[in-house]
């Protein structure tokens, strides 16, 4: 079993992976929804690629903000995702960071590569 999802009553769920790590989800305002968790996971997956690619640099911070548009009809799939990456540190060549983001979306980030079949994914980069 790779994942176990259990309803906790009301509008909350606990997700447990095969290593016993847990994450809580919910709906109706009682937790992060599975839809938003998917969006968070897209950002996290790609940001991991960027941070890992800069592991030999003096990176002081990295973040990504995501804006989401969904279809109006069910299933309300993701149709557009805009990602704004912000990274800072000492001697971070913008070309290198750009290449890391491009490679993340082209081949490494599993989640963005799944989502790009229904959503147009765009991004911008701010290196400070």
Residue spans for each PLM region:
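Extended beta-strand/beta-hairpin segments
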Residues: 1-41, 48-128
């Amino acid at each position: 079993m790779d994942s176990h999802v259990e309803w906790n009553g009301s509008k909350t769920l606990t997700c447990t992976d095969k290593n016993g790590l847990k994450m809580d989800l919910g709906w109706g305002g009682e937790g992060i929804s599975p839809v938003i968790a998917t969006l968070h996971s897209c950002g996290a997956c790609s940001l991991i690629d960027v941070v890992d690619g800069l592991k030999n640099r003096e990176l002081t911070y990295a973040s990504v903000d995501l804006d989401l548009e969904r279809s109006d009809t069910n299933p309300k799939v993701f149709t557009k995702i805009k990602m704004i990456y912000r990274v800072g540190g000492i001697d971070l060549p913008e070309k290198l960071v750009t290449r890391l983001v491009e490679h993340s979306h082209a081949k490494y980030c599993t989640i963005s590569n799944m989502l790009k079949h229904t959503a147009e994914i765009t991004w911008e980069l701010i290196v400070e």
